[in-house]
């Protein structure tokens, strides 16, 4: 079982590996239009059939390595049309591929570049338009958000997760990956099924997670790529 993947997306970002080796940080790459934003552009340009074809190859690789169940996140659309395209592609694959693919809506992966300076407008779109449509079509089991400095604040993240809960989506959270920012504490507060990354989680946050029964999903390969100590 792989409980945390971003398997359905367009394009690739191998050029950023060189930037990482030269010392650029995750957030520096993202703020320069790379990272999540680069993959968002390529995913918006891809058709649903192209996403299915690219994701099929990735799922084939998972299966060859003994993985039979995969959680898959959207979050490389950051608009209604492309988020739905990612989730619909995963739905098709879950029906046709040997792997069991469990979908997560992650419109809260980042604020798209066209909403820079208007973050609350994007959150309104996510809460009022994206989440209801995803729930209406039954395209996701979970609702995830990237609670991180420069992405979504704990308060914004809570709004997104609580909106999903009202629609029947189970909360998950990318927490304290780059900085200690209260993500672990928020996971406990909202009753998330899991908090993921946790490289910089506070001792208090971990204690609260344990008390609330939140699963810690640790991602050692991410720590290696970020050149950080493992959680």
List each model region and its residues.
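Residues at the C-termini of beta-strands that transition into short coil/loop
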Residues: 30, 107-109, 220
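Active-site-adjacent C-terminal substructures of enzyme catalytic domains
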Residues: 170-171, 180-231
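Divalent metal-coordination and catalytic microenvironments
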Residues: 4, 17, 66, 73, ...
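Metal-associated gating/positioning segment near the N- to mid-region
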Residues: 1-54
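Small/polar loops that bind or transfer phosphate-bearing groups
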Residues: 9, 175, 197
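Residues at alpha-helix caps and immediate loop-helix transition turns in enzyme cores, especially N-
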Residues: 13, 82-86, 156-157, 183, ...
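Metal-coordinating catalytic core of metallo-dependent amide/deamination hydrolases
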Residues: 34-55, 60, 68-181
């Amino acid at each position: 079982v792989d409980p945390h993947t971003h398997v359905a997306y367009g394009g690739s970002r191998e050029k950023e590996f060189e930037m990482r080796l030269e010392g650029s940080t995750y957030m520096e790459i993202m703020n320069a239009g790379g990272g999540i934003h680069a993959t968002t552009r390529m995913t918006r340009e891809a058709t649903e059939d192209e996403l299915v074809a690219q994701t099929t190859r990735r799922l084939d690789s998972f299966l060859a390595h003994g993985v039979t169940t995969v959680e898959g996140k959207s979050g490389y659309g950051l608009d209604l049309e492309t988020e739905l395209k990612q989730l619909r592609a995963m739905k098709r694959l879950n029906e046709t591929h040997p792997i069991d693919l469990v979908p997560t809506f992650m419109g809260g992966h980042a604020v798209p570049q066209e909403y820079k300076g208007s973050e609350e407008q994007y959150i309104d779109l996510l809460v009022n338009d994206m989440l209801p449509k995803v729930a209406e079509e039954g395209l996701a089991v979970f609702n995830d958000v990237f609670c991180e400095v420069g992405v979504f604040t704990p308060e914004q993240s809570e709004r997104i997760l609580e909106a999903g809960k009202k629609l029947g989506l189970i909360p998950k959270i990318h927490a304290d990956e780059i900085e200690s920012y209260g993500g672990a504490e928020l996971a406990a507060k909202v009753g998330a099924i899991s908090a993921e990354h946790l490289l910089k989680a506070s001792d208090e946050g971990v204690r609260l997670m344990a008390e609330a029964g939140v699963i810690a999903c640790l991602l050692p390969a991410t720590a290696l790529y970020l050149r950080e100590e493992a959680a």
